[in-house]
Amino acid sequence: MYTPEAIGTPLTPSSLKVLLLGASELGRELAIALQRLGIEVHAADRYAGAPAHLVANKAHVLDIHDEDAIRQLVREVGPHFVIPDSETIPAEVLQEIETNEVASVVPTALANRLTMNREGIRTFAHDKLGLPNSTFRFASTADELARAAEEIGYPCVVKPVMSSSGAGQSYVGGVDELEAAWNAALKHSRTNAQRVMVEQYIPFDYEVTILAVRSIDPATGREATWFCEPIGHRQDRGDYVESWQPAHMSEDALDTARSIAARIATALGGRGVYGVELFVKGDDVYFSEVSPRLHDTGMVTLGTQRFSEFDLHARAILGLPIDTTLISPGASAVIRCEDKHDGDIEYAGVNKAMAVEETNIYLFGKPRALARRRMGVAVATAENIDQARQRAEEAAGYIEVRPTVFAEGGQ
């Protein structure tokens, strides 16, 4: 992986360039972090005005699933680093970019390929690394799903092989619920492939995300892994709605969680932030998934850490020193649009939200309001997690996403 000896000046021949393939809200915060370090940021997405477009040095609109379009953009931009901001970027073109040394793919082309879907990463984690996980099978038809569920036993969980966050997941208590689970998985699949994963249901106590950060250790000159404090989170219908840090874990469970995170991040290689999702039951920890990029639950680090996950990702990509110090307990709560709105939108209640003690609001600037779409996040700190969660939830609740109300004489 390329390690720059110096950082040039953006928009000049000396510039150090990064290309984001995908321009989400996570990419937006990463772009800001990179720009603070003097990096020239290019952001590409399928629609104009995506969150990272609004802050990048240059914005590009193209089909980020089109291999030829990506190749052409890479030729035009000439980036030093290509950072996929989505699991749906074609693996073949990323491998081509890395193999031909056109640019460094973050963290690696292998990591992006294996984590494109649950089948690739779960098989790798189980067969190659021997990580503890629930029993699982894959199915391409409803009949295969029925046989797999029978082998694993009920209750079980059915998931699309490829979906966004937890979309399309179903708890299946018996055979009579399989058809609905199959249909839900196909409906929310990120591809047209009719393939699902069915896994043993573990009555876990809680879920955590471990952010594992891989960069160069200045003491040794070699790549090493650092860990942020564990992040707890809650989902609603598969979507992240709140997170908090630090999540309470026993010492044994935390040691195991960090060991699992280190093993998967090291095996996938490269530099950057890995978001490792784990189930915890007592002191037992089970691998669930890994994201070779920024993690939505990690938005809480905007308030809790000396350097947020975005700062850490930027530093790690460049091979710079890492500091994962926690400075305060904190929590985040998602600001969602409950209903679809056509046309321009605005955010009411910002004054009330920011009057909540130790709280900040981040609005993503998305151009369209869709039902249940994540439009921003409230981040709060406090002396303890319970208080921080209350503050974040209160602040998020004050924000109303609504059609723009023009004042008389306004434009």
Curated annotation (Swiss-Prot):
Name under which the protein is recorded: Formate-dependent phosphoribosylglycinamide formyltransferase
InterPro entries: ATP-grasp, ATP-grasp_carboxylate-amine, ATP_grasp_subdomain_1, PreATP-grasp_dom_sf, PurT, PurT/PurK_preATP-grasp, PurT_C, Rudment_hybrid_motif
GO biological process per UniProt: 'de novo' IMP biosynthetic process
Gene3D superfamilies: 3.40.50.20, ATP-grasp fold, A domain, ATP-grasp fold, B domain
Job description of the protein: Involved in the de novo purine biosynthesis. Catalyzes the transfer of formate to 5-phospho-ribosyl-glycinamide (GAR), producing 5-phospho-ribosyl-N-formylglycinamide (FGAR). Formate is provided by PurU via hydrolysis of 10-formyl-tetrahydrofolate.
UniProt: N(1)-(5-phospho-beta-D-ribosyl)glycinamide binding residues: E25, L26, D296, K366, R373, R374
Residues where Mg(2+) binds: E277, E289
NCBIfam families: PRK09288.1, purT
Keyword set includes Endoplasmic reticulum: no
Pathway: Purine metabolism; IMP biosynthesis via de novo pathway; N(2)-formyl-N(1)-(5-phospho-D-ribosyl)glycinamide from N(1)-(5-phospho-D-ribosyl)glycinamide (formate route): step 1/1
Enzyme Commission no: 6.3.1.21
Keywords assigned by UniProt, alphabetized: ATP-binding, Ligase, Magnesium, Metal-binding, Nucleotide-binding, Purine biosynthesis
Name of the gene encoding the protein in the UniProt record: purT
Positions of the ATP-grasp domain: 123-318
GO CC terms in record: cytosol
Reactions catalysed according to its record: N(1)-(5-phospho-beta-D-ribosyl)glycinamide + formate + ATP = N(2)-formyl-N(1)-(5-phospho-beta-D-ribosyl)glycinamide + ADP + phosphate + H(+)
